[in-house]
Amino acid sequence: MTGNDTVGKLVDLGSGNFAYLQEGGSWGWSNAGLVTSEGVSLLVDTLFDLDLTRQMLGAFGAATPAAARIETLINTHNDGDHTHGNQLVPGARIIASSAAAEAMAAGVQPGTFTQLLDNAAELGDLGTFLHRNFGAFTFDDIDLVLPTETFVDKLTVTVGTKSVELIQVGPAHTPGDVIAYVPEDNTVFAGDILFNGSHPVIWAGPPSRWVDACDLILGWDAETIVPGHGPMATNDDVRRLKEYFLTLIELGGELRQKGLTPWEAAEHVTSRGMWPTWGESERLIVNFASVYQQLGDEPTFPDPMDGLTAMAQFSVAHEPKETIS
């Protein structure tokens, strides 16, 4: 049972489509979607732990009988907050890009989160950060179920009489990011290509690929956009995110030329009050590191855990002190 009382909010998108939004949209608090037609459904992503996924499936089930017949599950990428509940959708086709499936198999497993949290008191700033951001989740009993089908570039699947277009736009946030687009309803499930109201995090990059992904979404002029984190979005939100990356690329080039490290570049941005309402400013460190890599530097954080540790140190340095009991 999750230790956090946050309950997601069901949003009826019309035309038989639904979103499930988790309040805040911070680390681990992701969104999901449901597309229905002719009494069957397609689920876009599961959540970070089993209890949260059960709550989400229950909300969809209360909203539409079609939720009882989930024929297809799309994992938009490999992160656990979009895949850890896969086991609760038995019998469904599970589809992801080939790159996402490979990253799921090779990446951080649910048990690793448990081990890190159990030892948080001994991990310094990293432990404080993990306790603060992931302590509300329970990773026990998760059996990570991998995709049963994969694709490269594009794939069209059907749910009832509707077509759902899956477009691989990664590597960007992660190696194999996928956007799900429902042309009939002009609805986009953007996965973590869209963080609404917080800094995104570039685990893979390059950031220029993320700009291209924003352009793809804007080209649809979608009526409905479900982000991977945060509240329902508009095309203006997508434009803001595109401008964010364009600014990071330009500013990162200037700061790199001046010899600033990614940490110092992040300090430069936060000290000037850029994007003051966006949460998770610690992500600027890995984002600038990705910009520097795109400009020719060797990877600053070849191991993702190194990047997470740097973000933890930055976050703890800029937040009130916390004691882990």
Segments from the language model and where they lie:
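Ligand/cofactor pocket segment of small-molecule handling proteins
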Residues: 153-220
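Divalent metal-coordination and catalytic microenvironments
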Residues: 16, 35, 45, 60, ...
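Conserved beta-strand hairpin/beta-sheet module of binuclear metal-dependent hydrolase folds
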Residues: 10-59, 178-191
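Active-site metal-binding motif and surrounding structural segment of the metallo-beta-lactamase
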Residues: 39-41, 51-96, 221
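Metallo-beta-lactamase
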Residues: 12, 102-105, 109-168, 184, ...
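C-terminal regulatory/interaction regions
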Residues: 258-325
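Active-site neighborhood of phospho(di)ester-bond hydrolases with catalytic His/Asp-centered motifs
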Residues: 44-46, 69-79, 95-97, 169-170, ...
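Divalent-metal (often Zn2+) His-rich catalytic cores of metallo-beta-lactamase-fold enzymes
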Residues: 187, 209-271
